[in-house]
Amino acid sequence: MAWHDVGPVENFELDTPKVVQVGEERIAVFHLEDGFFAINDVCTHEYALLSEGFCEAGRIECPLHQACFDIRSGKALDEPAEIDLATYPTRVERGVVQFEL
């Protein structure tokens, strides 16, 4: 496991993800009111990029079939998604947002 830089804290807008590609993994990092959260950027229902979906109240909606996920826990909240998203630890080091993968 290694920590990966996403960017300076001041470059994050609330509810707007930043996406980082690490090998085959696409990780979306969100700044919510209570902190930073990292999830797999690919919907578990069908291949769609969640970072292109609608984010509100700590939830991300898939742009393809409107499946919703909790950004903090990765939990699938609405059909058609039934499988939770992978989540990753985050931290802020010297003003830079990082996630562990």
Task: Write out the residue ranges for each language-model feature.
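Short cysteine clusters
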Residues: 43, 62-65
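N-terminal pre-ligand scaffold of iron-sulfur
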Residues: 1-57, 71, 75, 83-101
